Amino acid sequence: MKQYLDFLKLVKNIGVYKTDRTNTGTTSMFGYQMRFDLSKGFPLVTTKHVHLPSVVYELLWFLNGDTNIKYLQDNGVRIWNEWADENGDLGPVYGTQWRHWKNIKDKSIDQISKVVEQIKNTPNSRRIIVSAWNVGELENMALPPCHVFFQFYVADGKLSCQLYQRSADIFLGVPFNIASYSLLTHMMAQQCDLEVGDFIWSGGDCHIYSNHYKQVEIQLSRTPKALATLKIKRKPENIFDYSFEDFEFVNYIFDAPIKAPVAI
């Protein structure tokens, strides 16, 4: 994950100081891209521990169209706790937009099912896209989507994915986002009988929070290790039937966790 450390170092060195919604303050840079060849290893950061249950269960939660944190909490995942209301609800966030986007006729559109169909039947399409940025529902969301838009691309029997992330917490959030969408690409490729290609991460406002500066220094002092590999143990009937136990991250060797506060 040298690409990630290079990114972290660049923003630390040339980013500009900005205030932000959380009143924490950030060092920020606008626009960056990283490319990971998924056939050469699974892009999990090794210079600190990435909590894999959070990555996997959150993705399954998105795919289920769920927007209540009970499922996450039942599986030991707490990353959405701070934004939920007293009933555990988050409003029409990712799960709703991925699986139940409402059109002007108030009909529900399942974007995930649609892209699976497109990858299988019209792989050369330039419209294999999922968007979570529903302008008409932003005000009802506990937190507007940070990773807002992703597109699939098929060439030479390989499936690639590019994500656009409008707001990128580089130290805490981006390692999770890279892992999550890389996992989704593997799942989609398996469902569509393709090999994996590249995962491309593209960021808008890429920032390091001011209360993460010490943690960033610690991480940059560490040497990245060889990447893990992903083993998917079975092929379910569809993209929605995977479970946590279906995934094994082989030879994930990592340094100690580095704790940091989340900006709310």
Swiss-Prot record:
Q: Does the keyword Cytoplasm apply?
A: yes
Pathway stated in the Swiss-Prot or TrEMBL entry: Pyrimidine metabolism; dTTP biosynthesis
* The keyword Cytoplasm is annotated on this UniProt entry: yes
Keywords, A to Z, come to: Cytoplasm, Methyltransferase, Nucleotide biosynthesis, Transferase
**InterPro entries per the record?**
Thymidate_synth/dCMP_Mease (IPR045097), Thymidate_synth/dCMP_Mease_dom (IPR023451), Thymidate_synth/dCMP_Mease_sf (IPR036926), Thymidylate_synthase (IPR000398), Thymidylate_synthase_AS (IPR020940)
According to its UniProt entry, the protein's GO biological process terms are:
dTMP biosynthetic process; dTTP biosynthetic process; methylation
Q: Where does the record place it?
A: Cytoplasm
Question: Where in the sequence is the active site?
Answer: 146 (nucleophile)
Write out the residues that bind (6R)-5,10-methylene-5,6,7,8-tetrahydrofolate. Answer: 51, 169, 263
Query: Which GO terms label this protein's molecular function in UniProt?
Result: thymidylate synthase activity
Recorded GO cellular component terms are:
cytosol
Please write the reaction equations for the catalytic activity of this protein: dUMP + (6R)-5,10-methylene-5,6,7,8-tetrahydrofolate = 7,8-dihydrofolate + dTMP
Question: A Pfam family name for this chain?
Answer: Thymidylat_synt
| HAMAP family assigned to the protein according to its UniProt record, in alphabetical order | Thymidy_synth_bact
Describe, as the record does, how this protein assembles with itself and its partners: Homodimer.
Q: Which PANTHER family match?
A: THYMIDYLATE SYNTHASE (PTHR11548:SF9), THYMIDYLATE SYNTHASE 1 (PTHR11548)
Family assignment from sequence similarity: Belongs to the thymidylate synthase family. Bacterial-type ThyA subfamily.
Instruction: Provide the function of this protein.
Output: Catalyzes the reductive methylation of 2'-deoxyuridine-5'-monophosphate (dUMP) to 2'-deoxythymidine-5'-monophosphate (dTMP) while utilizing 5,10-methylenetetrahydrofolate (mTHF) as the methyl donor and reductant in the reaction, yielding dihydrofolate (DHF) as a by-product. This enzymatic reaction provides an intracellular de novo source of dTMP, an essential precursor for DNA biosynthesis.
What is the protein name for this chain?
Thymidylate synthase
Species source reads Vesicomyosocius okutanii subsp. Calyptogena okutanii (strain HA)
